[in-house]
């Protein structure tokens, strides 16, 4: 379907099907449409309401252009949509490190800061991790440690083609929804933090359509009503659980998992240096209780979707032990050292 027909359908207030959205995104990513047409297509898609079919179709188009990497089906991603303006430290990144120490295979897809002061790439880099390993080095790192960090610009170079247009539009489009679904390893297990409660069902259905095996879509809230794109240590967490094609909903509080509740200000983050120091202290076992328990809660969910814990409560115990026994600290050091070694070796081999 030519883009004019797609535009006509959207202008009539209709939504695009999976195939139509894929063709639309194929044309956008290949540079076949004018800037004016792309802006119109993206804006109308948003105005008409994004569907799970559209998200799945757009994802397929972008994933076909991704730099390939081969991990395995055990890999878990912990990520959020961003956009909650809560200013917390890098909880999902800390959770990935701790869950990995507990025995979860991690494929953390991330980037530098966009809506926050410090993104997952920023804090990992500050901790000493080499964030731009070539795919073959990342595969080796994963094979040795069960941990991989997949830097979005490295694996999705085609996204550069639309960066300027997205900035020009200046409002949210389907691209803002796609981020957590674009892990280049094609993970089947995820914790997806969603800041907008209205998007939870959309993510659950999109993940189902794209073959996810076990995912928890989480939306946290503080008791003051602040939305969070992560499990909340400051109030309730709404969960949609997708497991083998079936969905269930839950509303939980930290106390159900033997965790305390803490005000949002107690888990505030800051610069990359400050957030890295927070994570170091969590791993060292010297962090304030609020920081430690926020990371443990998210780690527990990763343990659950990763299949090593039978429930979140069991995952909490595993995450606690990884910290208290020193496993998390030693594991983080081993991952960082291995990434540096591989980066140096592959750099020598490419010279």
UniProtKB/Swiss-Prot annotation:
Pathway: Amino-acid biosynthesis; L-tryptophan biosynthesis; L-tryptophan from chorismate: step 2/5. One of its GO terms (biological process) is L-tryptophan biosynthetic process. It comes from the Bacteria. GO terms for molecular function: anthranilate phosphoribosyltransferase activity; magnesium ion binding. Mg(2+) 1 binds at residues 92, 230. 5-phospho-alpha-D-ribose 1-diphosphate binds at residues 80, 83-84, 88, 90-93, 108-116, 120. Binds 2 magnesium ions per monomer. Keywords: Amino-acid biosynthesis, Aromatic amino acid biosynthesis, Glycosyltransferase, Magnesium, Metal-binding, Transferase, Tryptophan biosynthesis. It catalyses: N-(5-phospho-beta-D-ribosyl)anthranilate + diphosphate = 5-phospho-alpha-D-ribose 1-diphosphate + anthranilate. Anthranilate 2 binds at residue 166. Mg(2+) 2 binds at residues 229-230. InterPro entries: Anthranilate_Pribosyl_Tfrase, Glycosyl_Trfase_fam3, Glycosyl_Trfase_fam3_N_dom, Glycosyl_Trfase_fam3_N_dom_sf, Nuc_phospho_transferase. Its EC number is 2.4.2.18. GO terms for cellular component: cytosol. Its cofactor is Mg(2+). Homodimer. NCBIfam families: trpD. Catalyzes the transfer of the phosphoribosyl group of 5-phosphorylribose-1-pyrophosphate (PRPP) to anthranilate to yield N-(5'-phosphoribosyl)-anthranilate (PRA). This is Anthranilate phosphoribosyltransferase. The lineage of its organism: Bacteria, Pseudomonadati, Chlorobiota, Chlorobiia, Chlorobiales.
């Amino acid at each position: 379907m030519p883009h004019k027909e797609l535009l006509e359908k959207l202008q009539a207030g209709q939504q695009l099907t999976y195939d139509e959205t894929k063709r639309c995104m194929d044309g956008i990513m290949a540079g076949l449409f004018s800037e004016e047409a792309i802006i119109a297509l993206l804006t109308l898609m948003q105005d008409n309401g994004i569907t799970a079919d559209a998200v799945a179709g757009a994802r397929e188009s972008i994933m076909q252009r991704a730099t390939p990497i081969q991990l395995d089906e055990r890999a878990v991603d912990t990520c959020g949509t961003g956009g909650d303006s809560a200013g917390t430290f890098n909880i999902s990144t800390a959770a990935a490190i701790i869950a990995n120490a507990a025995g979860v295979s991690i494929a953390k897809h991330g980037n530098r800061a966009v809506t926050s002061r410090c993104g997952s790439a920023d804090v990992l880099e500050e901790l000493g991790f080499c964030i731009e390993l070539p795919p073959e080095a990342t595969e080796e790192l994963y094979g040795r440690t069960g941990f991989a960090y997949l830097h979005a610009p490295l694996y999705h170079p085609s996204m550069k083609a639309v960066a300027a247009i997205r900035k020009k539009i200046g409002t949210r489009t389907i691209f803002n929804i796609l981020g957590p679904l674009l892990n280049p390893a094609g993970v089947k297990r995820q914790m997806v933090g969603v800041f907008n409660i209205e998007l939870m069902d959309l993510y659950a259905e999109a993940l189902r359509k794209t073959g996810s095996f076990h995912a928890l879509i989480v939306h946290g809230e503080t008791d003051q009503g602040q939305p969070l794109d992560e499990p909340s240590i400051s109030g309730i967490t709404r969960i949609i659980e997708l497991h083998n094609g079936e969905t269930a909903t839950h509303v939980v509080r930290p106390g159900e998992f033997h965790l305390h509740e803490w005000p949002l200000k107690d888990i505030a983050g800051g610069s990359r240096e400050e957030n890295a120091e927070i994570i170091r202290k969590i791993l060292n076992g010297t962090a304030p209780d609020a920081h430690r328990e926020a990371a443990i809660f998210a780690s527990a969910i990763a343990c659950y979707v990763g299949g090593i814990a039978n429930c979140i409560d069991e995952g909490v115990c595993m995450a606690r032990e990884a910290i208290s026994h020193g496993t998390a600290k030693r594991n983080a050091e081993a991952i960082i050292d291995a990434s540096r070694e591989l980066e140096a070796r592959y750099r020598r081999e490419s010279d």
